[in-house]
Amino acid sequence: MSKANISSKLKKVVESIYNPKLADSWDNTGLLLEAPFPRTNASSVLLTIDLTEKVAEEAISNKLVSSIVAYHPIIFRGLKAITMEDPQQRSLLKLAAEGIHVYSPHTAVDAAVDGVNDWLAQGIAGGRNNIKSVVPTQQNSVMAEAEGYGRICELKIPTTLRELVQRAKELTGLQYVQVCAPNGLDSHISKVSLCAGSGGSVVMNTDADLYFTGELSHHQVLAAMAKGISVILCGHSNTERGYLKDVMCQKLASSFHKEGVDANVIVSSMDADPLTTM
């Protein structure tokens, strides 16, 4: 198999798994940085949630990295200048000079079948037959009913909030999570509404016993509590990061293989949530 065509196949491979038509209209997904002179004989693709300077330096120092797939887009709003003064722009300039492409799939991963929200749903609820999207997409496809933002999980066996908190910790690898328990930790949960990242706009108007997401505003948590709805918050990127290692790595490697490309798909060791609980 070839190792020289990774950067040229990057867009096709990512979009074969995460259809860009699923991305939200406000989002900025796709190939965000196309290096003019791609690295030759580079066989690795680096996955990250956030393309920070530390992650960019990690990619640059590893001469086998040809491309970065950054879940969150490093370019979101229009740029009026690209200078070395701005940390993000500095990273882009360095990556371009080093021949490294950058692709961001973001909300296409959120909405896709077997995307980040299905990973959360299977981790918190188990099984697949009791999971559906909160906001289905309008795509004309056989998977349309399963695609979309957020997930509603109807638990086959009602489970205590205490147990679901433990599942959330195990899934995300966190020692601590934030919990709102208006009915107590031993209250039984039958229906979970979840969304990776900042899920308030998705979960808040759903009929559920528990909201499970990365972050909600203070007033959204108060509103949930007033309605007797429990809440588990793990931090924005903590609800996304584990998906890279558990699912995306294998999916991309398999898709590259189908294209006749022997790609080594790796997860950044420098990518981390910016907040730490002490």
Curated annotation (Swiss-Prot):
Q: Which Gene3D superfamilies match?
A: NIF3 (NGG1p interacting factor 3)-like (3.40.1390.30)
- Give the matching PANTHER family: NGG1 INTERACTING FACTOR 3, NIF3-LIKE PROTEIN 1
Q: Which Gene Ontology terms of cellular component type are present?
A: cytoplasm; cytosol; mitochondrion; nucleus
Per the record, the similarity remark reads: Belongs to the GTP cyclohydrolase I type 2/NIF3 family.
> Which NCBIfam families does this one have?
YbgI_SA1388 (TIGR00486)
Name by which UniProt lists this protein:
Protein NIF3 homolog
Lineage of producing organism:
Eukaryota, Fungi, Dikarya, Ascomycota, Taphrinomycotina
Pfam families attached to this UniProt entry: DUF34_NIF3
The species is Schizosaccharomyces pombe (strain 972 / ATCC 24843)
Name the InterPro entries for this protein.
DUF34/NIF3, DUF34/NIF3_sf
